[in-house]
Amino acid sequence: MIPNITQLKTAALVMLFAGQALSGPVESRQASESIDAKFKAHGKKYLGNIADQGTLNGNPKTPAIIKANFGQLSPENSMKWDATEPSQGQFSFAGSDYFVEFAETNGKLIRGHTLVWHSQLPSWVSSITDKTTLTDVMKNHITTVMKQYKGKVYAWDVVNEIFEEDGTLRDSVFSRVLGEDFVRIAFETAREADPEAKLYINDYNLDSATSAKLQGMVSHVKKWIAAGVPIDGIGSQTHLGAGAGAAASGALNALASAGTEEVAVTELDIAGASSTDYVDVVNACLDQPKCVGITVWGVADPDSWRADESPLLFDASYNPKEAYNVSQLLSRQHAFDLYLKLGNLLLSRLHSD
């Protein structure tokens, strides 16, 4: 029996990626050209990762892999409110300064993460009940943190995870005290603090075009933009379960319809890290003109917040997985051409037999 084209493609891909994995050195770079460079060659701005002082000073393979493979960095924790302003008016930038210095020294684009978030929030903020006080506190925090790195950060996640699963605003100190006006306050303050930075709203579970949460995000962002709120981009965290990559294209297209200049995949990890899922997400960004880049949320599985799900591109020994080698292809057309050629060879062999 002659196999169908799907079987041929699968067989060819296995052959192709197995060959790549065996041919590359198991060191900082697993290919002659970084995956960031390949992504940029397709017109995108970056393919990045995360870092902080702890991970950079842990396994030495982590900074080596970052330097060789990724073009952008986000701080995992060092720019969050509890790290930068643990006590009111007392700012601490030791961790974030370390992160920024590493990124700048190694020529990495920086995404700031995150300014206003209900989690990792000091109790002195979450206990505020007065509108004027909370407004002043928000403005001071956003302004101080952003000016610390003015001109150094490409984009900021200004507000993070502000929606419930049904698409309504999450209950938080910000929404309770200020209503949805906290979004306007945050973005207007951020624009004033660094007019050149791209300003993002960022959230998780924006992974299906038909989900209530995604639709709530789109409708709110459209409304806020129409009202003059300076939102430049929507970030989809994209923490996926196994097999969920196929919906990424529709989800990114739906987010792009909100009217922002940009969209981005900001915290990518996928349970099981299958090559199919990673390729689906990469191609979803490549196919959406407004998608500027992808940030993978961690280098190797031991450092992941989902370590037991093995969701990243590098395994527990810091070796590249098949998904890394697949991501090297980046272009769907490139991948199709390669496995079609191999498929034709297989067909010819089968017919000759």
From Swiss-Prot:
It is an enzyme of class 3 (hydrolase). GO terms for biological process: xylan catabolic process. Glycans are attached at residues 4, 325. GO terms for molecular function: endo-1,4-beta-xylanase activity. Residues 1-23 form the signal peptide. Optimum pH is 5.5. It comes from the Eukaryota. It catalyses: Endohydrolysis of (1->4)-beta-D-xylosidic linkages in xylans. It is found in: Secreted. Its main location: secreted. Keywords: Carbohydrate metabolism, Disulfide bond, Glycoprotein, Glycosidase, Hydrolase, Polysaccharide degradation, Secreted, Signal, Xylan degradation. Optimum temperature is 15 degrees Celsius. Disulfide bonds join 285-291. InterPro entries: GH10 (IPR044846), GH10_AS (IPR031158), GH10_dom (IPR001000), Glycoside_hydrolase_SF (IPR017853). It holds the Pfam family Glyco_hydro_10. SUPFAM superfamilies: (Trans)glycosidases. Its EC number is 3.2.1.8. Residues 50-330 form the GH10 domain. The active site is at 161 (proton donor), 267 (nucleophile). GO terms for cellular component: extracellular region. Pathway: Glycan degradation; xylan degradation. Belongs to the glycosyl hydrolase 10 (cellulase F) family. Cold active endo-1,4-beta-xylanase involved in the hydrolysis of xylan, a major structural heterogeneous polysaccharide found in plant biomass representing the second most abundant polysaccharide in the biosphere, after cellulose. This is Endo-1,4-beta-xylanase. The lineage of its organism: Eukaryota, Fungi, Dikarya, Ascomycota, Pezizomycotina.
